[in-house]
């Protein structure tokens, strides 16, 4: 009975959520679109003609926003473990990003192109136990940073969902070695009870002289 009540409360919160209603009205696949739109409004992160990688893309809310902003001259490579309905001019790679074969598929899709921006809204399935969830979340963050270090052009940018807890401070220090400017963002469209924040790193310096970050 308690579980049924919890499910009912979640559904009520979901459908009463103004961002869910806005997404339905505006044609976005998820409320997450407004998190990226809010960051974009503040930081002007995405520009026409850019090459972008979107990790944790399904159901496609961030990809929809990014595709519109980069326009026909831009290029977007998206990936998720879940299926995602196609979006025009978006290359989608389905698979588990923790597996090397999926990394290789992404790198193959990138080819010799230098990437302007890597964005990641990835998160593990949460158990509610911090001792379990934080290592899983940080593992995904490390892998996303590893990819960014491989593909970003000098001066490129990196936006990633993070959860503060064990391992975050070391991760934050690693990023500060690789980028000129690092800031935290908490969009108003992110639910108050959510521990998520977004780390925005700008001005990729390249890996020369910085700590080597190895893929696990």
Swiss-Prot record:
Keywords: Cytoplasm, Methyltransferase, rRNA processing, S-adenosyl-L-methionine, Transferase. The keyword Hydrolase does not apply. S-adenosyl-L-methionine binds at residues 60, 62, 80, 96, 121. GO terms for molecular function: rRNA (uridine-2'-O-)-methyltransferase activity. One of its GO terms (cellular component) is cytoplasm. The gene is rlmE. Its EC number is 2.1.1.166. It is found in: Cytoplasm. The active site is at 161 (proton acceptor). Specifically methylates the uridine in position 2552 of 23S rRNA at the 2'-O position of the ribose in the fully assembled 50S ribosomal subunit. It catalyses: uridine(2552) in 23S rRNA + S-adenosyl-L-methionine = 2'-O-methyluridine(2552) in 23S rRNA + S-adenosyl-L-homocysteine + H(+). Belongs to the class I-like SAM-binding methyltransferase superfamily. RNA methyltransferase RlmE family. The lineage of its organism: Bacteria, Pseudomonadati, Pseudomonadota, Gammaproteobacteria, Pseudomonadales. It comes from the Bacteria. This is Ribosomal RNA large subunit methyltransferase E. The keyword Transferase applies. Its main location: cytoplasm.
